[in-house]
Amino acid sequence: MWNEFLKVSLHDPIIWLAFFAGTLILFVWRREVKRARLLEQFANARGFKFERAFDLAELRLSKAGFFSWRDRAKNAISGSMDGRRFTLFEQHANRGKYKSFIRTIVAFEIGPSTSVRSGALGGYGLQMEKTSNHLFVWQAKRRVPPEELEPFLHSIVRNVEQTIH
């Protein structure tokens, strides 16, 4: 009976489709777990705080134009670099059919009266948005690999220092 079941099922395209879909899901899940582990190691090695999921209300992302109600924020790293407090996180965005992306965003705490020179970061390929208490900086639809986080953070902190006053 078991042999007959195998003969029939191995010739069924639905079985093969389910097998490949399951394999793909497992591969993506394992890659995300590995990435989160690398980000956590990066944060711990530098004395930063790491959270796989964090409270979105803390950054008031609902007031930011780049963040949709369907988006999720994951893998947050927070700390201080060159005297500036930051929170780095990954935005998992879904803008409809076949329009999803993940990008790395760095949020800096600023005061409500802080002024930002608009367009100052554009020359570096960076985009930014200011809300009442935060300045958000990112590269368009780019997810920064863990091995590039250190230079990415230093570059953004340096550029933000020149942008705000």
PLM regions: where:
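Charged, low-complexity intrinsically disordered regions
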Residues: S9, L38-R46, F50-E58, K63-H165
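Core hydrophobic alpha-helical membrane-spanning segments
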Residues: L17-I25, E109
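Hydrophobic alpha-helical transmembrane segments
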Residues: L6-A18
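Membrane-interfacial helical/loop segments at transmembrane boundaries in membrane proteins
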Residues: M1-E4
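Transmembrane-cytosolic junction motif
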Residues: G22-G47
